Amino acid sequence: MSDTTIAIRSEETKPDYAEQSGAVNLASPRLGANLLEVSDEFFGSRTRMLEDAPPVFYPDRYDDHGKWMDGWETRRRRDGGNDYCILQLGAKGTIAGFDLNTRFFTGNHPPRAKIEATLTDDIPTNTTEWFELVPESDIAPDSQNQFPVTD
């Protein structure tokens, strides 16, 4: 039996901030969103981070790096640094909030996250000014971690 015949798909809920504002997913690959840089993608490719469909779990799927997961997954940091990604949104717009989805990531989810943004048409550099949109916050495993943005 192929692992594609036994798939568990999660049910996702649209956050209140998105329902109320009629928000569009600015991080959608269909709009042209692109991941410019990631600190590591050993266990899960960056391309799995921007899927429009809800995450899926295949109990018996493995690849060259171990258990296949439907999301971006890094090796654990041992050098004191942080894992990060730089995402270019698919369109300019007002950000209503974020959904950091850890569905099916139970012991391998990030414990915390912080989200910063910049408005630029160029690739960010060391001198780029970043603005905090979501302060460092705890992230729950196997969940939609939703963070509305108020400013």
State the predicted function of each range.
Residues S2-Y84, F105-D151:
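Trp- and acidic/polar-enriched beta-sheet ligand-binding modules for extracellular glycan
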Residues C85-L87, A96:
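General structural concept
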Residues L89-A91:
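A short glycine/threonine-centered beta-strand motif
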Residues G93-F104:
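A short beta-strand element within beta-rich, extracytoplasmic domains
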